[in-house]
């Protein structure tokens, strides 16, 4: 069973940005409890050229169901707002 999600942002602070950690909002997940069940699952993003970048959900972000995913390589800026597949 796979779930679609939207890439919201990089994990960042006022002065630093972590390019290989993304904040993702899974569709139809609206609480921290539902999001915590996704920890450890694989995240796939397909680039416009067809390359597939893999990541893993490492923790929940906030209380509205967003999660943090750590990728092998950092995602490019064109991934922001794009869909990912959570397997």
From Swiss-Prot:
**Record's InterPro entries?**
Ribosomal_eL33, Ribosomal_eL33_CS, Ribosomal_eL33_sf, Transl_B-barrel_sf
Top-level taxon in the UniProt lineage: Archaea
GO MF terms on file?
A: structural constituent of ribosome
Using the chain's own numbering, where are the disulfide bonds? Answer: none
Question: What UniProt keywords apply to this chain's record, in alphabetical order?
Answer: Ribonucleoprotein, Ribosomal protein
Which Gene Ontology terms of cellular component type are present? Answer: ribonucleoprotein complex; ribosome
- Any single Pfam family the record assigns to this protein: Ribosomal_L35Ae
A GO BP entry is:
translation
Q: Which PANTHER family match?
A: 60S RIBOSOMAL PROTEIN L35A
Q: Which family does it belong to?
A: Belongs to the eukaryotic ribosomal protein eL33 family.
Protein name stated in the entry: Large ribosomal subunit protein eL33
Organism from which the protein derives:
Pyrococcus woesei
Q: What is the lineage of its organism?
A: Archaea, Methanobacteriati, Methanobacteriota, Thermococci, Thermococcales
């Amino acid at each position: 069973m796979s779930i679609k999600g939207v890439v919201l942002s990089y994990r960042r602070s006022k002065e630093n940005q972590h390019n290989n950690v993304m904040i993702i909002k899974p569709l139809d997940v609206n609480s921290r409890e539902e999001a915590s069940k996704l920890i450890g699952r694989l995240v796939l993003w397909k680039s416009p050229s067809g390359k597939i970048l893999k990541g893993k959900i490492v923790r929940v972000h906030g209380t509205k169901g967003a999660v943090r995913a750590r990728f092998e390589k950092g995602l490019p800026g064109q991934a922001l707002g794009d869909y990912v597949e959570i397997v």
